[in-house]
Amino acid sequence: MSKISRRDFLKVTGIAAAAAALTACGGSSSTASSTASSAAASPEVVKKLDKISVAVPNDTTNEARALALLEKNGFFKVKADAGLTATKNDIEENPFNVNIDEVEAAQVPSVLQDEDYAVINSNYAISAGLNPVEDALAIEDGSSAYVNVLVCKDGNQESPKIKALAAALESQQVKDFIDEKYAGSVVFVVENPTDGYDSTVDYDALNGETVSCAATPAPHCEILEICKDILAQKGITLDIQEFDDYIQPNNVVEDGQIDTNYFQHQPYLDDFNQEHGTHLVTVAGIHVEPMGIYGGKQDSLAPIEG
């Protein structure tokens, strides 16, 4: 999908009038600007809002992550002991009367126009045509505990074809692709990238084999396409199975339908195993997708900075 600006994104999701009033590059606002647009442009008006609405992902680890980012940017304070399972019920100081709306992670971009702000995972922001580096009002840095991982069922970690896929994902070729394609929206975290291959794997024995991987569209499937080319040079087929949710990619690996998955960060995997009784383990940590705060009805963080 080609990237569109935040203004164009909001326009196609139903608030063209508000977006048009927030013209860039020194342009003046239309005298016919809506009340919502005027409020977004004027801190004096914004400060009088009764509450500020923020959409966040509703799964445990991503909600806690979103709340931590909001807290860091001054929206409220969360109980010190809430940790990686914090929910909106753990907010203890809320001077701006922030109302948290919990939404399924993939759907958060679709409600952006209805909220003052939304906290969106980078993969879903990218899929929605947003550029996390350019469009987010605030964004995590790359030093995050939320590393996206390659996962298999416990007991299969030493499978040669899974090790071959891990080496491809940890490669310099993947690093170069991520750096060029995403320019900070996705951050490669492997300290010593491989040449695409694992010296302990007998690639001749894998010639003609297939390794399957469940993944979400962007950036995971796009990154796996680089791995497909790397593995093809050794006669290995990478079967990429695309999913749009955060549940089935784990279920199909747990029941043996698919060898691996690549879509989730480590805290989500840990929480999923605990909640569902699955036996999934990390093979390799590949990248971080910095979570960002995006403006819907508001175009800056002025309402919480005054």
Please describe what each predicted stretch is:
Residues 21-24:
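C-terminal motif of bacterial Sec signal peptides marking the signal peptidase cleavage site
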Residues 40-69, 73, 163, 171-176, ...:
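A conserved helix-loop-strand patch within extracytoplasmic ligand-binding domains
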Residues 50-55, 206-218, 236-242:
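Short, well-ordered beta-strand elements
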Residues 65, 79-86, 163-202:
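Ligand-binding clefts/hinges and TM-proximal coupling segments of bilobed small-molecule sensing domains
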Residues 68-75, 86-89, 217-248, 252:
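Short, polar/charged alpha-helical segment
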Residues 82-110, 240-251:
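Short helix-initiation/N-cap motifs at beta->coil->alpha
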Residues 126-158, 190-198, 283-295:
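Periplasmic-binding protein-like
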Residues 141-142, 147-181, 297-300, 304-306:
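Extended ligand-binding regions for polar small-molecule ligands
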